[in-house]
């Protein structure tokens, strides 16, 4: 119980009651990998971000003329011009057309979209709808143009939160403006040119898909981070009421952006950002496990448990998370994907080994070891475990399913020729002798589709061959059957003719005998008649 209580304390930050016995499960090859907090999200609102791509330069005493800014302005104009033209083509109806397609009362230039999916048309509708907020966008534009503040908020009657970001201005404020009077114009111009050149390279790289069609290509995570610059955490905190870090929200792809306007005169880009609503279920943990083979009842086996489970209080479910977004510490889902576990699986997760089910392993390509917090958990009965420092072979007893190798046992470990450095101590305080009955091992090998298809194809080819041979045999049998039928018919007719002949002979013999008998009686009667006549005459 001591080891189990230690495991519970390890998860106390997430939940007050943890039933999964991590230590016992690790001894049978079921190793915990990651614990994540479960959160649900939905796209519910949007905000507009105004990005000023050309910074304000504080006037200097020596009136420096920064040629780098002029060149940067020219290059950036060439970069943004295709985006602005593309947006205008999509947001404006096609010229010369009397009838325009309308979505929610807004005219869209369908010809500018080309072949587009439903999602892309929806994105175009979103772009055009953003044009209706021209007053709010203009207010943000005019506000940001004359200020050196990197972030501020503007609220309209719709209570939509708009955040204006100057990605370059933050750097100008903290570095450049403090040194303007202490450096020559040439040095300042060179330093500014270097910074602007790097930023321009970054913009060109991350916005390359936007040059094709900004309405149909959402802004990538890299583009959002590039736009926001060092202001990313502040923007996320201002738009989302959550304690989750900005890095995790962006890496999960929960914030999606779309360029809706480009103002070439002011060198500003207006981006619509879809802001998700995030709700965290405080007592719900999603635990990832990694299964390796174990030595059970003198054979290599693997435990039959799901790779990911959801634990809420004292209950566990299988949790595939097929449609979720995973980060290091959180898992974001639009709905709950939990699936029920059998009672035996729950008992097994709780550390009741007698309720666990194992499947025998067939084949040599199997997961036989895993790195865990600087230690190695391996099935040393199915692979060669050799400690190189100090040098000795590692033996796994029959009553141990796997072997945990930490710094006290080995410093440099070789597993079938692969070398690992052990840097940590194992947190397992005890290891018990495992007793697993033969009835707990069942055959649940997954089907190798390619192999089975090859077998089926071979069987079909053999079947076709046998069918051809069978048809040939049937043809020969049918011919022989005709000849046999003729012979049998002849024999039957011959027998019938013999029988008829015998019957005819018998009938002829009987008829002849009967005729003779009748003739004899007739002669006898005639003799008697003659005698009677003679007697009468006498």
Curated annotation (Swiss-Prot):
Keywords from the UniProt entry: Cleavage on pair of basic residues, Coiled coil, Disulfide bond, Fusion of virus membrane with host cell membrane, Fusion of virus membrane with host membrane, Glycoprotein, Host cell membrane, Host membrane, Membrane, Signal, Transmembrane, Transmembrane helix, Viral envelope protein, Viral penetration into host cytoplasm, Virion, Virus entry into host cell
Cysteine disulfide partners in this protein: 324-333, 348-356, 380-385, 387-410
Residues making up the signal peptide according to the UniProt record: 1-19
Fusion peptide: annotated span: 103-127
GO cellular component: host cell plasma membrane; membrane; viral envelope; virion membrane
Site (Determinant for fusogenicity and cleavage efficiency): 95
Glycosylation sites: 56, 73, 182, 352, 427, 433, 457
Assembly notes: Homotrimer; disulfide-linked F1-F2. Interacts with host LAMP1; LAMP2 and LAMP3; these interactions promote the cleavage of the viral fusion protein F.
UniProt remark on domains: The 2 coiled coil regions form a stable six-helix bundle.
Protein known as: Fusion glycoprotein F0
Organism, scientific name: Mumps virus genotype N (strain L-Zagreb vaccine)
Lineage of producing organism: Viruses, Riboviria, Orthornavirae, Negarnaviricota, Haploviricotina
Gene that this polypeptide is encoded by: F
């Amino acid at each position: 119980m001591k080891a189990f209580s230690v495991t519970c304390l390890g998860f106390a930050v997430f939940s007050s009651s943890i039933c999964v016995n991590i230590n016992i499960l690790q001894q049978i090859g079921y190793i915990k990998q990651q614990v994540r907090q479960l959160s649900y999200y939905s796209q519910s609102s949007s905000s507009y971000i105004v990005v000023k791509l050309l910074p304000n330069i504080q006037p200097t005493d020596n009136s420096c003329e920064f040629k780098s800014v002029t060149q940067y302005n020219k290059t950036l104009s060439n970069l943004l011009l295709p985006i602005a033209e593309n947006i205008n083509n999509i947001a404006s109806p096609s010229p010369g057309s009397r009838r325009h397609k309308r979505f929610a009362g807004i005219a869209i230039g369908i010809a500018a979209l080309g072949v587009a999916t439903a999602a892309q048309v929806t994105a175009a509708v979103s772009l055009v709808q953003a044009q209706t907020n021209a007053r709010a966008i203009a207010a943000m534009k005019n506000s940001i143009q004359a200020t050196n503040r990197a972030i501020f908020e503007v609220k309209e009657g719709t209570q939509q939160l708009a955040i204006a970001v100057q990605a370059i201005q933050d750097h100008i404020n903290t570095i450049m403006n403090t040194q303007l009077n202490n450096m020559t114009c040439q040095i300042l111009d060179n330093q500014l040119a270097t910074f602007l050149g790097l930023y321009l390279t970054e913009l060109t790289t991350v916005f390359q898909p936007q040059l094709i069609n900004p309405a149909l290509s959402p802004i990538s995570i890299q583009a959002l981070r590039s736009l926001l610059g060092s202001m990313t955490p502040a923007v996320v905190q201002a738009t989302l009421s959550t304690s989750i870090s900005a890095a995790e929200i962006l890496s999960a792809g929960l914030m999606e952006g779309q360029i809706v306007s480009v103002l070439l005169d002011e060198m500003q880009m207006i981006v619509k950002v879809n802001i998700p609503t995030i709700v965290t279920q405080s007592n719900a943990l999603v635990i990832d496990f990694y299964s390796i083979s174990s030595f059970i009842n003198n054979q290599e086996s693997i435990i039959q448990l799901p790779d990911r489970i959801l634990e809420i209080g004292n209950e566990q479910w299988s949790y595939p998370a097929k449609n979720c977004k995973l980060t290091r510490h959180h898992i974001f889902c639009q709905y709950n994907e939990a699936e029920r576990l059998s009672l035996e699986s729950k008992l097994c997760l709780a550390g009741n080994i007698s309720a666990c089910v194992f499947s025998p392993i067939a084949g040599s390509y199997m997961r036989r070891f895993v790195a865990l917090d600087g230690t190695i958990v391996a099935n040393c009965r199915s692979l060669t475990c050799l400690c190189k420092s100090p040098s000795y072979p590692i033996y796994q007893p029959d009553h141990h399913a796997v072997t945990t190798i930490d710094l006290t046992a080995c410093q440099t470990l070789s597993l079938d020729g692969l070398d690992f450095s052990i840097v940590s101590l194992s947190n397992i305080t005890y290891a018990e002798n495992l007793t697993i009955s033969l009835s707990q091992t069942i055959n649940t090998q997954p089907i190798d589709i390619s192999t089975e298809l090859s077998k089926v194809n071979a069987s079909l080819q053999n079947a076709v061959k046998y069918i051809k041979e069978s048809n040939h045999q049937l043809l020969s049998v049918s011919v022989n059957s005709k000849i046999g039928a003729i012979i049998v018919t002849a024999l039957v007719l011959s027998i019938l003719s013999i029988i008829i002949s015998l019957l005819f002979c018998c009938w002829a013999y009987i008829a002849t005998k009967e005729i003779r008998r009748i003739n004899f009686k007739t002669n006898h009667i005639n003799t008697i008649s003659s005698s009677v006549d003679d007697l009468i005459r006498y």
